[in-house]
Amino acid sequence: GKGRFSMAKPIALAADHGGFELKEAVKAHLEELGLEYIDFGTHSTDSVDYPDMAVPACDAVVSGQCEKALLFCGTGVGISMAANKIKGIRACCCSDSFSCEYTRRHNDANALCMGGRVVGPGLACQLVDIFLNTEFEGGRHEKRIAKLMAIENR
């Protein structure tokens, strides 16, 4: 149900033209859940470049303005590559519930990327629910995350 969801801060949304329609479907889902979001664009199906779309949304997560990011492109892969270049972002590209759950539990992912040409709106909304509701387990995973983040400082 609805009660599971409580975000201290808004969710950052961003997409290129290939992910625009899926972003809009997820946005409607967040509204149904009563969750706040900031839509960093794009706002149409006109062609834009996914790195340009990823950066402002991811910066909002890293700065603490937003809780997590939901990012969309044609496959989810390009925008995940862009997101993972941003210091402090741990982006996953998911199209199945198991990966989506465990990337939160074990990797403390803070950006979920999906492909508008890969994932339908129903599955996308399910994955968003899993992503937003699953807590990081910590424990043995803490040192692995620390090692992952240390790569950014080489």
Q: Which residues are covered by each model-predicted region?
A:
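Glycine-rich phosphate/diphosphate-binding loop of Rossmann-like nucleotide-binding domains
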Residues: A12-E32
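A short beta-strand-loop structural module common to alpha/beta enzyme folds
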Residues: E36-S47
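C-terminal binding/interaction regions
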Residues: A12-A14, G18-G19, S97-R154
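Short, structured active-site "lid" loops
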Residues: M53-L71, T75
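Solvent-exposed alpha-helices and their adjacent loops that cap or buttress functional pockets
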Residues: M7, V61-Q65, R104-H106
